[in-house]
From Swiss-Prot:
UniProt feature coiled coil, ranges: none
The organism's taxonomic lineage, starting at the top: Eukaryota, Viridiplantae, Streptophyta, Embryophyta, Tracheophyta
Name of encoding gene: GRP23
Basic and acidic residues composition bias: residue spans: 108-130, 899-913
Any one of the GO BP annotations: cell division
Protein name: Pentatricopeptide repeat-containing protein At1g10270
Pfam family, one: PPR
Length: 913
């Protein structure tokens, strides 16, 4: 094969295959072939063959080219650099460029994870104590704080600003503190309602007294409130405070409010100086700030100065919105110079800029204000033609509302409906998707005109579009129904308002319920009010007052009694005047004791079924204490500071409507009792104790208040075996005392895993905690029960019941079927010994889990724990409170009278059986 033939073959191979060949390898092969006579063309090698026949052994050439020996004087070819291997991933350069742009966009949208979060292994950075505190970011508006924000916003939308303010203010003292966004929402709502003094007071409360860090929006709102109230100097003080102390600079909105206030106060020179200061601080030229100054100079008649500022704005403003042209148009219309006004309008249209809804709305209002309806309709139609969402938004609900209101003002109701549904005439224009504000406006307008048929049609259309429910439209419909004497429809609309969780404000609710009761809708009013009480926030006390008085005047005493019970249960509170009225009415009917029993009862907050046991009870919706509510003694430590309560310890995880073991009742001197809910179970009284005897420490209540609790075995509680524990239901503000322990002391209670050991800590080998052998003054009498009344004690078998009755002072308290004189030693136990309570089987939980507090322990008192509960059993610790002056449980030195080890083991085996 010749060299040229081989080169052609190699060239063909390299052009038809995608895998490239190494240039150095190709040169080496060509070099070997050129020196090998075996590969030469036969026609050109005839002479060489003859020489080889003549000299057969002359430089023999092997057949394998790889074994060919290159002469020493031969110079090897220069090696070329290797070509890197690259696959052709794109068909064109444009496709490759598009891929690069896509990757860059993705990096901008999705930054790498290491840029989003800090390395978890790295220690947290230390905060500079001298660094200024920064306001909350939007990432703080999550979880419970977001729920609080939504609740406040719902109250604001319902126009119940007092309830929203109360909720936000009282949340400062809870674990869920409001964010700066929640504070700004209620402050802005007060400003919009022209309640400037309350807005300023809320700012002082949140950001100065409650130590919440304000942001620039907070300062802008308080500056705006000061300016509208006429206190421009106070607004300037806030502005100087921002410059001196805030970790951010004032925004353009800050200068808008300040220049507006200064111009309204007649200090236009100070406003101009503030504009120069804004520009010197690097702020961009703002058309609204310039418009405030131009409006001020036009009002003063200084047209040249206004034009000067307008020219300055056009030279500095990069994006002009056309609002200043509307100011000049209004000025010329007021002067009666319509020609100049329209010339200013045409100059604005000649700019061919995209008109946004705020600018178009201002121009529409100017045209309609001065009777230029043709120009207004032409501008409205042009805005509809240019509306092509999502890229171009030329119309909003305010735009349509302006023209609809003009139609109602002129009495053209059919034209109002057509305007409401009007669409642009251009091919590219799209219909405006009306929001709930637009539907609320047209429904309100029809209700004002008494056109309930059209109002109902648009109201139903808004509901069918799944728009968010709004309180103003519901209130307008209810008022229209009452005005038209359609009482049943008014009741249905009020019921729907409650169903969609809209707030019924105090003034509106009192007026509507009064009208319903006046028209004989007593039962319906009570039903709607009951449904309102099941939701948060609770109805205002004034609404309850109107309904209760109406029911009493209508001789519906049973329903009035139920409503009063709901007021007590919801912690709404009964005023003194209403209380006297109710008692007087029921006394005339001979039912005074019945209503007094309800009025003197005290509701206890019930934890929701979804809450865990290690969280404090839910704060009622309406704060404050009921007059009959018992107060917590001051010397008790609150239970909320303890972290040892488990979710299955029976803290009232009941179903809806269940009360956790009863409620506080003032039983005219009766002592509290533990009452069993079963019919065949007897009550065990904690009363009738002789002088010198000390009641259990957990039952100490304030004078005049007793606690009636029950061993109620209700379904839905969190005990493992269905045995419910019913020792909660405290009123708002009451907390379970856990024994005034000094720091460092902790009591480990029940619900420990089998691997955990419960032991009587820090006792000497000779010390034993005695439940018996107490002096006559130190014994606890277990209720002087009649003979035969036995207390079933935690799943005992038949015949294994303990009688706690009829004990004399010299008798001892038998624990777990002990005979008189037997003592139960709780100390000196080895690790393998285990205490059991009253014949429990594996997996059962004793009903005696009313964990009594350790009374008044001091720093020298030891920590109490039980020893090694049997696997599957939940240890039933009953800390004793048989304390006298020393407030310590009895201890006894080791002696012959103690229980021996064999007796103890026999007792344990017997209890297991």
């Amino acid at each position: 094969m010749s060299l040229s033939h081989l080169l052609r073959r190699l060239c063909t191979t390299t052009t038809t295959t995608r895998s490239p060949l190494s240039i150095s390898f190709l040169h080496q092969r060509i070099h070997n072939i050129s020196l090998s006579p075996a590969n030469e063309d036969p026609e050109t090698t005839t002479g060489n063959n003859q020489d080889s026949e003549k000299y057969p052994n002359l430089n023999p050439i092997p057949n394998d080219p790889s074994q060919f020996q290159i002469p020493q004087n031969h110079t090897p070819p220069i090696p070329y650099p290797p070509i890197p291997h690259r696959t052709m991933a794109f068909s064109s350069a444009e496709e490759a460029a598009a891929e690069r742009r896509r990757r860059k966009r993705r990096l901008r949208i999705e930054p790498p994870l290491h840029a989003l979060r800090r390395d978890p292994s790295a220690p947290p950075p230390k905060r500079d104590p001298n660094a200024p505190r920064l306001p909350d970011s939007t990432s703080a508006l999550v979880g419970q704080r977001l729920n609080l924000h939504n609740r406040v916003q719902s109250l604001i939308r319902a126009s119940d600003l007092d309830a929203a303010s109360k909720l936000a203010r009282q949340s400062v003292f809870s674990n869920t503190r409001p964010t700066v966004f929640t504070c700004n929402a209620i402050i802005a709502a007060m400003y919009r309602a022209k309640r400037y003094s309350e807005s300023i007071s809320l700012f002082q409360y949140f950001f100065k007294q409650s130590n919440i860090v304000p942001n620039v929006v907070s300062y802008n709102q308080i500056i705006n409130a000061h300016c509208d109230e006429g206190n421009v100097d106070e607004a300037l003080e806030v502005y100087r405070h921002i410059l001196a102390n805030a970790p951010f600079a004032p925004s353009s909105v800050t200068y808008r409010h300040l220049t507006k206030g200064l111009v309204q106060a007649g200090r236009i020179g100070d406003a101009a100086s503030l504009l120069r200061e804004m520009l010197s601080k690097g702020q961009a030229a703002d058309s609204t700030v310039y418009n405030n100054l131009i409006r001020g100079y036009l009002d003063l008649g200084d047209f040249d100065k206004a034009v000067e500022f307008f020219d300055e704005l056009k030279s500095k403003c990069t994006v002009y919105d056309g609002i200043v042209n509307a100011t000049f148009m209004e000025y010329w219309f007021e002067k009666g110079n319509d020609k100049e006004a329209m010339e200013s309008y045409r100059s604005l249209l000649d700019k061919k800029f995209r008109m946004h809804p705020p600018t178009g709305n201002v121009l529409l209002e100017v045209f309609l204000k001065f009777g230029k309806k043709d120009e207004a309709w032409a501008l409205f139609n042009e805005m509809l033609d240019n509306h092509a969402p999502p890229n171009i938004l030329s119309v909003n609900s305010d735009t349509v509302g302006i023209m609809v209101n003009e139609c109602f003002k002129m009495g053209e109701f059919s034209e109002a409906i057509n305007t409401f549904k009007k669409v642009g005439s251009k091919v590219t224009s799209k219909p405006f998707v009306m929001d709930y504000l637009g539907y609320c406006n047209i429904v309100t307008r029809f209700c004002e005109q008494g056109m309930l048929t059209e109002a109902e049609r648009f109201f139903a259309e808004g509901v069918s579009r799944s728009l968010p429910a709004d309180a103003p439209s519901h209130r307008a419909m209810i008022d229209a129904y009452l005005k038209a004497e359609r009482i049943d429809d008014a009741v249905k609309m009020l019921d729907r308002m409650v169903d969609v969780n809209l707030r019924v404000v105090a003034d509106f609710g009192a007026r509507v319920f009064g009208e319903l009761i006046k028209n004989g809708k007593l039962t319906e009013s009570a039903e709607v009010l009951t449904k309102m009480g099941e939701r948060e926030p609770k109805p205002d006390p004034s609404i309850y007052d109107v309904v209760v008085r109406g029911l009493c005047d209508g001789d519906a005493l049973d329903q009035a009694k139920d409503i009063v019970g709901e007021m007590i249960r919801h912690n709404v509170g009964v005023t003194t005047v209403l209380r006297e009225f109710i008692i007087e009415v029921f006394e005339k009917a001979g039912r005074r004791e019945e209503i007094e029993k309800i009025l003197n009862s005290v509701a206890r907050p019930v934890r929701n079924a979804g809450q865990s046991g290690n969280t404090p009870p839910r704060v009622p919706a309406v704060f404050g204490t009921t007059p009959a509510a018992p107060q917590q003694p001051r010397d008790r430590a609150p239970w909320t500071s303890q972290g040892v309560v488990h979710s299955n310890s029976g803290w009232a995880n009941g179903t809806a409507g269940q009360t956790a073991g009863g409620a506080y009742k003032a039983n005219n001197g009766q002592n509290p009792s533990w009452s069993n809910t079963s019919d065949n179970q007897q009550q065990q009284s904690w009363s009738n104790q002789t002088a010198g005897q000390q009641p259990p420490s957990w039952s100490r209540q304030a004078p005049g208040y007793q606690q009636q609790q029950s061993w109620s075995q209700q379904s839905g509680w969190s005990s493992p075996s269905g045995h419910q524990q019913s020792w909660t239901n405290q009123t708002a503000g009451q907390q379970q005392p856990w024994a005034n322990q000094t720091p460092g002391q902790q009591q480990q209670w029940a619900n420990q895993t089998p691997g955990q050991q419960q032991q009587l800590a820090n006792q000497t080998p000779g010390q034993q905690q005695q439940w018996a052998n107490q002096t006559p003054g130190q014994q606890q009498q277990w209720a002087n029960q009649n003979n035969g009344h036995q207390q079933p004690w935690a799943n005992q078998n038949t015949g294994h019941q303990q009688s706690w009755a009829n004990q004399t002072p010299s008798q001892q308290q038998p624990w777990a079927n002990q005979t008189t004189g037997q003592q139960q030693g709780w100390g000196n136990q080895t690790t393998g010994q285990q205490q059991q309570w009253a014949n429990q089987t594996a997996g059962q939980q004793s009903g005696w889990t009313a964990q009594q507090q350790w009374s008044n322990q001091t720093a020298s008192h030891q920590q109490s724990q039980w020893l090694n509960p049997v696997p599957g059993e939940v240890a039933n610790q009953t800390p004793w409170s048989n304390s006298v002056d020393s407030h310590l449980p009895q201890q006894q030195e080791p002696g012959p009278s103690h229980e021996c080890q064999e007796t103890q083991e026999k007792k344990v085996v017997e209890l297991r059986n």
